[in-house]
A protein has these predicted regions:
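A short, histidine- and acid-enriched strand-loop-helix "catalytic/donor-clamping" loop
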Residues: 53-56, 74-90, 106
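Membrane-proximal helix-turn-helix segments that form the acceptor-binding/catalytic region
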Residues: 63-74, 90-106
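A charged, aromatic-enriched C-terminal amphipathic alpha-helix characteristic of glycosyltransferases
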Residues: 270-278, 284-325
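Donor nucleotide-sugar binding/catalytic pocket of nucleotide-sugar-dependent glycosyltransferases
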Residues: 102-119, 123-138
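Short hydrophobic beta-strand element within catalytic cores of glycosyltransferases
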Residues: 247-253, 257
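Short N-terminal targeting/anchoring amphipathic segment
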Residues: 30, 36-59, 76-78, 226-228
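Acidic donor-binding loop of glycosyltransferase active sites
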Residues: 217-233, 243-246
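Conserved catalytic-core segment of nucleotide-activated headgroup transferases in glycan assembly
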Residues: 145-204
């Protein structure tokens, strides 16, 4: 099986036992190169596309998917992102999806809402698989009741107005009897909005700078984690919070609430419009609820095994149906 990308926490988590992953971690994937694909078509039973194709033109994606068909290599697609946050138009992203979903043997996604959208927009039935566990709670690390965390960093199209988000989150944390901690990855500290440093200096909020490897630990220390991405189909951070026992406040745009019942939504659409009053209220509502317990490891392990079994059955099905071009 050739996975695109070759390695990723999600791709690793869903890989079934006994399935060999071939290729390397080159970016963009060598499997997008027609010559490489033709030379190695007989070495692979299935190509599984997750992400990593945004840098290609839509016409190139269409030509690539047609080349897979000519070579007789089945394509499996997991749809991770149905929208393109921060882009002025979703046309390019939609065209990419249309190109690969039109030729995929099997389509998967991670929430019922996303599957409904895929059916409506692209006429494909998607198999819904749960997002498997991606973190393990540290038994030595406690959480602070009332502590609200919001990740901030370099300017991003997916978070067009971070100052509005921070001020609304601060209002929600304080009105709910808590406090706000801004989480800043080390690599993004130089690009941090100066206003946030000033707010920390005056004691309005706390800044916590962390290395990327400690992200799950940072989330575990919170009562509430606020997700700031503009409009996601689903979120890995929701699953990390489920694993470590942190309540989530997430945008209403997308299907975050489909992932976990502990998600509290706030109004935020794919065009970057965030309702500050809604965010403040959502944080207050989340703080009024008890902190969830970390996910039961036996249940999460069983869920992961079931997800891997679905992938194993899909791979076996499409490989068995394969006919050489």
């Amino acid at each position: 099986m050739a996975a695109i990308p070759h390695r990723d926490p999600y791709v690793d988590a869903v890989l079934p036992d006994g399935v060999s992953r071939i290729g390397d971690a080159a970016e963009p994937s060598r499997w997008f190169d027609h010559a490489h694909l033709a030379a190695h078509a007989r070495d692979v039973d299935v190509v599984h596309l997750h992400v990593g194709y945004g840098q290609l033109e839509a016409a190139a994606m269409e030509a690539w998917s047609e080349e897979l068909q000519r070579q007789g290599v089945p394509l499996v697609v997991t749809v991770h992102q149905l929208h393109a946050p921060g882009q002025p138009s979703s046309g390019s992203h939609d065209a990419h999806l249309a190109a690969v979903l039109g030729t995929a043997e099997v389509v998967l996604t991670l929430t019922p809402g996303a599957a409904d959208d895929i059916a409506e927009r692209y006429g494909r039935t998607a198999i819904v698989v749960a997002h498997p566990s991606v973190a393990v709670a540290d038994p030595e690390l406690g959480a602070e009741r009332g502590l609200v965390g919001l990740r901030v960093g370099a300017p991003s199209p997916s978070v067009p107005d971070p100052v509005v988000l921070v001020r609304a989150a601060l209002s929600g944390a304080v009105s709910g009897g808590g406090r706000l901690r801004l989480l800043v990855e080390e690599a993004e500290l130089p690009a941090l909005e100066p206003a946030f440093g000033a707010m920390a200096d005056t004691g309005q909020l706390e800044l916590a700078v962390f290395p990327a490897a400690e992200w799950a630990a940072q989330l575990q220390q919170l009562h509430v984690a606020v997700l700031s991405e503009q409009c996601g189909t689903h979120s890995r951070d929701v699953e990390v919070c489920r694993d470590v026992g942190t309540r989530v406040v997430a945008p209403s745009c997308g299907w975050f609430a489909d992932q976990w019942s502990e998600v509290v939504p706030y109004s935020h659409d794919e065009h970057g419009r965030v309702d500050a009053v809604s965010l403040t209220a959502a944080i207050g509502a989340a703080l009024a609820r008890p902190m969830p317990r970390p996910a039961d490891r036996v249940w999460r392990d069983g869920q992961r095994d079931a997800v891997r079994q679905v992938h194993a059955e899909v791979y076996a099905q499409v490989a068995g149906d394969r006919s050489w071009a």
